[in-house]
Amino acid sequence: HVHMILVPSDADGLRAALGEAHRRYTKHVNDREGWRGYLWQGRFASCPMDETHLLAAARYVELNPVRARLAQQPQAWRWSSAAAHLDGRDDALCTVAPLLERVGGAGESWAAFLSETPGDEDAFDALRLGERTGRPVGADMCRNPFTATDRHP
């Protein structure tokens, strides 16, 4: 499975971008393998989140390959954004500035951020619940104009 932190440019942006990615990848694999039909179990899961949970989500996503024992260090996982954040350089899929600005920069600052775990398990549980339900995660979301009722099915 894949974890991504995405910020859509409009209310329909996430659905449109991921739908197109699913279609293209499915076509690529089906053409290569001579298959027909769907590759994905279902629609992607998503939830809006507040600033605190954004940082917890970043830590969760970048540490996931280590937790799953796919890599010994986050930056060693080929498909992780950890190397880009540690180097402080955008790559083809990741714009690093928005998260680096929140933790004090790249390199040692990002490495220290990844090693912190204050209340992470509670935040991770909240993120998992938000992912399953599609409901907003975090205290600030009550005031956020983008709520679960604004999303398209």
Explain the meaning of each model-derived region.
Residues 1:
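Basic, low-complexity intrinsically disordered segments
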Residues 7-153:
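Short Pro-Cys-Gly-centered "Cys-loop" motif that presents a nucleophilic cysteine in a tight turn
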